From Swiss-Prot:
HAMAP family: GlgC. InterPro entries: ADP-Glc_PPase, ADP_Glu_pyroP_CS, GlgC_bac, GlmU/GlgC-like_hexapep, NTP_transferase_dom, Nucleotide-diphossugar_trans, Trimer_LpxA-like_sf. The gene is glgC. It comes from Acidothermus cellulolyticus (strain ATCC 43068 / DSM 8971 / 11B). NCBIfam families: glgC, PRK00725.1, PRK00844.1. Alpha-D-glucose 1-phosphate binds at G164, E184, K185, S204. One of its GO terms (biological process) is glycogen biosynthetic process. Belongs to the bacterial/plant glucose-1-phosphate adenylyltransferase family. Its EC number is 2.7.7.27. This is Glucose-1-phosphate adenylyltransferase. Homotetramer. The keyword Nucleotidyltransferase applies. It catalyses: alpha-D-glucose 1-phosphate + ATP + H(+) = ADP-alpha-D-glucose + diphosphate.
Amino acid sequence: MANRQRVLGIVLAGGQGRRLLPLTADRAKPAVPFGGIYRLIDFVLSNLANAGFLKIVVLTQYKNHSLDRHITTTWRMSTLLGNYVTPVPAQQRVGPRWFSGSADAIFQSLNLVYDEQPDYILVFGADHIYRMDPRQMLEEHIASGASVTVAAVRVPRKDAHAFGVIQPAASGPERGRRVARFLEKPADTEGLGLPDAPDEVFASMGNYCFTTAALLDAVIRDAADERSAHDMGGNIIPMFVERGDAAVYDFHTNQVPGSTPRDHAYWRDVGTLDAYYDAHQDLVSVHPIFNLYNQDWPIYTHHRPLPPAKIVHDGTSVVDSLLSDGVIVADARVSRSVLSPSVYVDRGAVIEGCVLLDNVHIGRGAVVRNAIIDKNVVVPDGAAIGVDPQRDAERFTVSEGGIVVIAKNAVVEP
């Protein structure tokens, strides 16, 4: 049923990602590399494309050059069939101003909706790690009769303070399906537990399915409200909740081809350095919590013409790690790490629990532990990173969890 409807995908990709600094100092948050060869935005675009939703606009704003370049070089659809993935920056169609919120981004881009005339609009975020078949959400939305359906992931009630929390109806024919309340990062979680799991709550995933007319009406009215922050989660969704016109979609029910009980319903918000690091650690075990190797629901990205990874010399050890194309590990030890394209690890180096982005060079005898190193950084021979917390804090960014982060193109002293 879902594929017979006219559906437009709108991906909100204008986020700055301040909590991911310095990784976002030179790029938009959705353009941050992940998992060796991907960008964060590849996950939402792959979910939409795998589901057959091939008319997608990506609303961009903050430091969008690398993001726009990635989309235009990677996500080229067949124009013969009218399909497209198009990055759309703020165009100042309603005056000399940029996007002032996610709802305002849609309001300023309504010409794209009018041109396509869809029956339904999928408004999805651009910076989460997950697999999802959005057709199933659309089908539930149509069956519910609601104007909007909000996708929700189950999280422990004790963690509710970190999320926008959806409280579903606790009784009546809409029990567990209609949204009774929407609370942003509630301090008091008493009574917010789910009807079938009192110790869990629904956290908003930032993914919404709208009936088109309802979304148009909402963003137009919101644009006229000078008191509004013009935010989808903070202003638009509460409009529908207040009048009982919002449904909730339980992400746990989503069935993705090729998924296993271990990675079923995996979803990660990688909005902090520690969360970004932890999500990489989810990739590297023998049976990973998130499996990049599921070819029944592939994650698409741009593949550069690089040679295969190479491991040389008898003394080399690589354990529980991902090696991308162009990587060379020469008589060194690598464990629990993700190495992006063209990383070079020289003789005698030790890499433990690290995320190394493109073109990082690790010198001879260097020791690097629990670190994220951005592109084009040269770690000199004999350097020690992640070994002396005090010296690390003097030279680099250190996350709350103790992860050392080195900015793109940084010069590392011996």
